[in-house]
A protein has these predicted regions:
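Conserved phosphate-binding catalytic cores of ATP/NTP-utilizing and phosphoryl-transfer enzymes
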Residues: 1-15, 152-177, 341-349
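Helical "lid/coupling" subdomains associated with nucleotide-phosphate turnover
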Residues: 99-104, 108, 156, 163-167, ...
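Gly/Thr-rich phosphate-binding beta-strand-loop-beta motif of the actin/hexokinase/Hsp70
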Residues: 7-42, 168-196, 213, 242-246
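Phosphate/pyrophosphate-binding loops at sites that engage ATP/ADP/AMP, CoA/4′-phosphopantetheine
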Residues: 114-126, 220-227, 283-301
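Residue-level signature of catalytic and energy-coupling elements of molecular machines
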Residues: 29, 45, 111, 148, ...
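Active-site neighborhood for divalent-cation/phosphate handling
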Residues: 102-169, 206
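Phosphate-binding glycine-rich/basic clefts of nucleotide- and phosphate-handling proteins
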Residues: 47-63, 190-276, 301
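Conserved phosphate-binding loops in N-terminal lobes of ATP-dependent enzymes
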Residues: 24-129, 279
Length: 360
């Protein structure tokens, strides 16, 4: 996917430039800037439900970690959940048409809030690179552009796995697997900007694991009281796909409200493993359609990124499946939370000044 740029009109000041790299995640958004700022926040926007919640919060709109903490007092929106605005059609993402405008408003407000965390000095030009899912449509990319209008002077949209590859300098003969909350994106790197044929996107990612685990646990432990967020927290504490001796034990209220310990090891493991077949199928597709001379070299350089890359044993499980291709080597990025934002920032900073001027 070739980079696309757009300029927000109306600002002509030339008092310096702040470059920003942003990974607008379905669950969390990370941002890095040339002034040293590095932040990660929940990708959630909330509006007070009534005058009481408005008085308690003292504001008309709440973002990120604060919105997540007070979500019961708010009408909340995760503007990029299930790939909405970024990848899937709004009907695919389960967004009612009458709510789509609210999702777009939330996306715009979230981008503005995240940029404000970078504290750009007054009069500074803000240039940004933002990651989108590998197979995002032109319509989805336009929705991201619209969310950035008025906040950035110029914006470049690149695929999330490409941003990871650029940041880790993994630009040739490599396969990047970026496992987020809403999508899992695979990208084949061959020393140039990847085309659509070099990329695969799957809707089975972190949210899919959470929802499947929720249903499996509900079936296995009908006496337990829990929410999807409690399942997500349990997954993040002890998620694994391979056979280990560790147990995933949680203390949740039972039907009577008494704290009770439940063993959800089997259910969590089954849910976490459920994303693996699509990842392996995507890798097979990208490898089998690559130049035969370089297939083996590419299989020796599979890189896992994104929050889902922290699933214990995922790298070994994929390596086992790659044995039918003669084997492969799977590694994980060192900073899964910031790998996309760091790469986007590096790309923004490396672009020649003339390149940004051309799109202003």
């Amino acid at each position: 996917m070739a980079p696309e740029l757009e300029t927000a009109a109306g600002r002509t000041t030339k008092e310096g430039v702040l470059y920003i790299g942003m990974d607008l995640g379905c669950y969390k958004t990370s941002v890095a800037a040339t002034n040293g700022t590095r932040e990660v926040v929940y990708s959630i926007v909330g509006w007070p439900k009534d005058p009481i919640s408005r008085k308690m919060l003292g504001k008309d709109i709440v973002f990120g970690n604060e919105a997540f903490q007070h979500r019961l007092a708010l009408d909340t929106i995760r503007p990029f959940e299930k790939g909405a605005l970024k990848y899937a059609d709004n009907s695919e993402a389960g967004v009612p048409p009458e709510r789509l405008a609210k999702y777009k408003e939330a996306a715009k407000e979230l981008v503005k809030y995240v940029v404000s965390l970078c504290r750009p000095p007054k009069g500074t030009l803000v240039y940004g690179v933002i990651g989108s899912p590998a197979r995002a449509s032109i319509l989805n990319k336009q929705a991201l552009m619209d969310a950035c209008k008025g906040t950035f002077e110029a914006v470049m949209i690149v695929s999330e796995p490409f941003a990871v590859a650029y940041g880790t300098n993994t630009l040739e003969d490599a396969l990047i697997v970026d496992i987020g909350a809403g999508t899992t994106d695979l990208c084949r790197m061959h020393g140039a900007i990847p085309t659509e044929e070099d990329q695969v996107t799957s809707g089975k990612a972190g949210d899919f694991i959470d929802n499947l685990a929720f249903e499996l646990i509900k079936k296995a432990h009908p006496e337990a009281q829990f929410t999807i967020n409690m399942v997500r927290e349990a997954k993040e504490r002890g998620s694994f796909v391979n056979d280990v001796n560790d147990k995933a034990l949680v203390t949740w209220p039972n039907k009577d409200g008494r704290p009770t310990q439940f063993d959800i090891t089997k259910e969590l493991k089954e849910a976490c493993r459920a994303i693996v077949p699509d990842i392996v199928a995507g890798l097979r597709k990208l490898v089998s359609s690559y130049d035969a001379e370089f297939q083996k070299r590419m299989l020796q350089n599979v890189v896992l990124a994104g929050g889902g890359s922290q699933l214990r044993g995922l790298d070994r499980l994929i390596e086992d499946d790659l044995q039918q291709y003669g084997g492969g080597k799977v590694t994980k990025v060192h900073e899964p939370v910031f790998a996309g934002a760091n790469g986007a920032l590096k790309l923004a900073a490396d672009m020649p000044e003339d390149y940004w001027k051309e799109v202003k």
